[in-house]
Swiss-Prot record:
Record-linked NCBIfam families: PRK00103.2-4 (NF000990)
CDD domains: RlmH-like
Protein's name in the database: Ribosomal RNA large subunit methyltransferase H
Localisation per UniProt entry: Cytoplasm
Family membership: Belongs to the RNA methyltransferase RlmH family.
Chief place where the protein resides: cytoplasm
Gene symbol of the encoding locus: rlmH
Secreted found in the keyword field: no
Entry keywords, A to Z: Cytoplasm, Methyltransferase, rRNA processing, S-adenosyl-L-methionine, Transferase
Length: 157
C-alpha cells in the first residue's frame, strides 16, 4: 500500500518543514509515502468561501485516481488514539487498497464534491491547529502508527 498526503499551500515555517522532512524520511522505512502540496489559489481575496472551496476541491480531485481511497482530515471527523489509528492502518493494508490518500484542506474546509468522494473523515483533536502544523502532527502519527505495528520502542503506553 502507498500513502499520500495532499495539502493546500506550502509550509512557510522552515522549522516546521525541517521536522516534516525528518518524519517523512523516517516514515519511508515503513511504507511508500508522498506529500503532495497543491499551490495556494491566486487572487483568493476575490473569491467567496464557497468559490475557494470549489477551486481547491477541483485541484484535490485532480490528484486522485478512481482506485484511491480518500480520507479527509476534518475537524468533524472521528478521533482515534494512536493505537487505534495504527489498527486502522493495518486494516487498510490488509484490505488490498493500493493507495490511501489523506487530505488536509484549505482554511474553509472541503467542497461538496470532495466530501462525496471520501471514504471517511478523521480528526487529530477537538482543538484547532494551523494547517501547516497539522501536516507535521499527522505525519508524526503515521510514523508512530507504523512503529506501533512493528512493536518498536517509539510509542509508550
Amino acid at each position: 500500500m502507498n500513502i499520500k498526503l495532499i495539502a493546500i499551500g506550502k509550509t512557510d515555517n522552515k522549522n516546521l518543514q525541517t521536522l516534516i522532512d525528518d518524519y517523512t524520511k523516517r516514515l519511508s522505512f515503513y511504507i511508500k509515502f508522498d506529500l503532495e502540496i497543491i499551490a495556494d489559489i491566486k487572487n483568493v481575496k476575490n473569491l467567496s468561501e464557497t468559490q475557494q472551496k470549489e477551486k481547491e476541491g477541483e485541484l484535490i480531485l485532480s490528484k486522485i485516481t478512481p482506485t484511491d481511497q480518500l480520507i479527509l482530515l476534518d475537524e468533524n471527523g472521528k478521533t482515534f488514539s494512536s493505537v487505534a489509528f495504527s489498527d486502522q492502518l493495518q486494516k487498510k493494508m490488509n484490505s488490498g487498497i493500493k493507495t490511501l490518500v489523506f487530505v488536509i484542506g484549505g482554511p474553509y474546509g472541503f467542497s461538496d464534491d470532495v466530501y462525496k468522494k471520501t471514504f471517511g473523515k478523521i480528526s487529530l483533536s477537538q482543538m484547532t491547529f494551523s494547517h501547516q502544523m497539522v501536516r507535521l502532527f499527522f505525519i508524526e502519527q503515521l510514523y508512530r502508527g507504523f512503529t506501533i505495528l512493528k512493536n518498536e520502542p517509539y510509542h509508550h503506553q
